[in-house]
Amino acid sequence: MKKRMFSLIIVLSMLIVGIPMIAHAETSGKCGDNLTWTLDDNGTITISGTGDMINYEYYNLSPFYNDNSINSVIIEDGVSSIGACAFVGCSNLSSIKIPKTLTFVGGNAFNDCANLKKLYITDMAEYLNIDFGNSVTHILSGSNNKLYLNDKRVTSIEIPNTVTRIPKFAFCGVDSITDVIIPDSVTSIGDSAFRNCSSLRYVDIPDSVNVIGHYAFCDCESLEEIELPKNITYIGNLLFYDCRNLSKIVLPESIVDIYNYAFSGCWKLTNIKI
């Protein structure tokens, strides 16, 4: 009797102070009309089938919500979207592999996934064609991220000439990238596209690019010089913020506006050409 009473007191104490009680999670289920998921003993979620994932909300929680047993996610060929709020709070999620069939990532899909640092892709052009939801969203975030193309870590990037735009957050925080060559087919670079690429030293931007988003090269601390394309009309918020080794920049005559803190922290910037 005393033993049972003691156990009850422990349970009640946990509830009062807010200590979470761990329950056994399901290991398989559906996450779309034609999609299923499985969780193995190593903490890997595999999503397979065809079509779109369900879009979740905070009142319609994903089966993966706040699941700290998930270490990696593999999304197989045939899956076309990652649902909104799909992996919110998966604090131990460290890597994700996405297929070339993926075309959309829903808003807040990876919110509070602070350890998500490795992204595996199989096709660069298809990766850069992914659309993101209306909410501020990304796959990788922060710094010290790793991008792998066919299991090889990406360092130098030559964007395929079938690509027409580089989406927001595309290479955010990928610290291994040293140089990027962008083809004439590209017309825009999205917000934070190369933000926190700490090893990025060289970017070749063609004159076909007429829009460069806010924060696009923010915190690229190894970038030393850059020439902006002749058709852009503004320099966005914090575009080169804290590019501490940037010493030379060539600006086009088309510039009519420079937004807040565009060159703040560029302590070595002494050569500006127009």
Which residue ranges define each predicted feature?
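Short, T/G/N/S-enriched strand-turn elements that build extracellular solenoid repeat scaffolds
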Residues: T36-T38, C85, G107-N111, I130
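Extended Gly/Ser/Thr-rich low-complexity repeat segments
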Residues: M53-S69, F171
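Bacterial N-terminal signal peptides that target proteins for export
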Residues: M1-I10
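GGW-centered surface loops in extracellular recognition modules
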Residues: E26-T46
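Consensus positions within tandem repeat domains that build extended binding/scaffold surfaces
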Residues: G83-A86, G106-A109, P167-A170, G190-R195, ...
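Bacterial N-terminal signal peptides
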Residues: I9-G18
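Sec-dependent signal peptide cleavage junction
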Residues: G18-T27
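Structural signature of tandem-repeat unit edges
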Residues: N42-G51, N68-S81, S91-F104, A114-I130, ...
